Amino acid sequence: MNNRIPEDLIERAYQGKSTKEDGLLLLEVPPFELFRFADELRSLTAGDTVTYVVNRNINFTSRCVGTCGFCAFRTNDGKVLSIEEIMEKVREAEKAKATEVCIQGGLLPDVGLDFYQEIAESIKAEFPEMHIHAFSPMEVYHASHISGIKVSEALSKLKRSGLDTMPGTAAEILSDRVRKIICPSKLRTAEWIEVVTQAHAAGIPTTATMMYGHVETPEERIEHILTIREIQKETGGITEFVPLPFMPYNNPVGEKIIREGRYATPGLDDLKIYAISRILLHGHVDNIQASWVKLGKKLSQFALQCGANDLGGTLMEESISRLAGAPNGESISVEELEWMIYGAGRVPKERTTLYKGVRELASRNPGRITGCGASE
């Protein structure tokens, strides 16, 4: 194990030029040395502000023709929400002062792009200020093929219908070796990259994710992060990077690795991923999000000391992680998020999906919270 981070690696990180070899070496650095450097870069980029968004997740169907081995959400005959049922959830979100609705669902066998356009158009007609963060690259790819149009045309249509941004989900690990094992029917690495870069070209920013902790190697994790960096260097359209630990429960891939004696990734490994993501993406992707749903509330707080500067959203509902065994709930209040952030020694700030400030929440602070969680 290397006791210190080499000076030349530090210099490359500051310049935004970290290499694959740097990423692999960082895996061998003592954890708290790694966390300290990632936190230093986080401070340079984001200061002591930790952001979150008031949003609502809407999963409009679990019905899906996909065959992803990691999914506990998919069904063959799940209900598909009607436009009116979706709109009722949007109305509830608006009453809760949400600024964003995040809408995704399974891959429907006979539903083309028109349905997705109708969702966006209905929301914008009633709530023109509501930000629509919706439809994964896989959903767009699937719907465009059913409709017999190019992905670029589908994205242009969705943009005109009111789609504001797109989740960078369905990325899993951007390695075709891995994808053939865990999601053989899903779009290949090059196809995912194409959908995302075409979304950026159409004026639709995206997030980017990485689902890790299943069959991938350490090298494939590092390569995934560097692939995201290359996309960002080309387009500048990625708003945040979200590492997502795999939930190995109630799904075939998870059942297999549990039989092999492995379980969910250890918390220390999760924190290393956040730290290495911050270091490799420094100067390119400013925002690293810690998913409280996946990590849990306490480990998410610790991730804020390891490179993360965002805690995601209030959600209101979340089915996919819950069904895969995530025990951390589906909804969180603004007040609890603020409490968590102060408890980590940081200053909370509500943001929009595009990381514009909505309002500072310091006025709600019941008493300054130190990094150890004690009130002064």
Curated annotation (Swiss-Prot):
The keyword Translocase does not apply. Binds 1 [4Fe-4S] cluster. The cluster is coordinated with 3 cysteines and an exchangeable S-adenosyl-L-methionine. CDD domains: Radical_SAM. Its cofactor is [4Fe-4S] cluster. The keyword Magnesium does not apply. InterPro entries: Aldolase_TIM, CofH/MnqC-like_C, CofH_family, Elp3/MiaA/NifB-like_rSAM, F420, FO_synthase_su2, rSAM. Residues 50-284 form the Radical SAM core domain. Its EC number is 2.5.1.147. Keywords: 4Fe-4S, Iron, Iron-sulfur, Metal-binding, S-adenosyl-L-methionine, Transferase. GO terms for molecular function: 4 iron, 4 sulfur cluster binding; 5-amino-6-(D-ribitylamino)uracil--L-tyrosine 4-hydroxyphenyl transferase activity; 7,8-didemethyl-8-hydroxy-5-deazariboflavin synthase activity; iron ion binding. [4Fe-4S] cluster binds at C64, C68, C71. It catalyses: 5-amino-6-(D-ribitylamino)uracil + L-tyrosine + S-adenosyl-L-methionine = 5-amino-5-(4-hydroxybenzyl)-6-(D-ribitylimino)-5,6-dihydrouracil + 2-iminoacetate + 5'-deoxyadenosine + L-methionine + H(+). Pfam families: CofH_C, Radical_SAM. Catalyzes the radical-mediated synthesis of 5-amino-5-(4-hydroxybenzyl)-6-(D-ribitylimino)-5,6-dihydrouracil from 5-amino-6-(D-ribitylamino)uracil and L-tyrosine. This is 5-amino-6-(D-ribitylamino)uracil--L-tyrosine 4-hydroxyphenyl transferase 1. It comes from Methanosarcina barkeri (strain Fusaro / DSM 804). The lineage of its organism: Archaea, Methanobacteriati, Methanobacteriota, Stenosarchaea group, Methanomicrobia. The gene is cofH1.
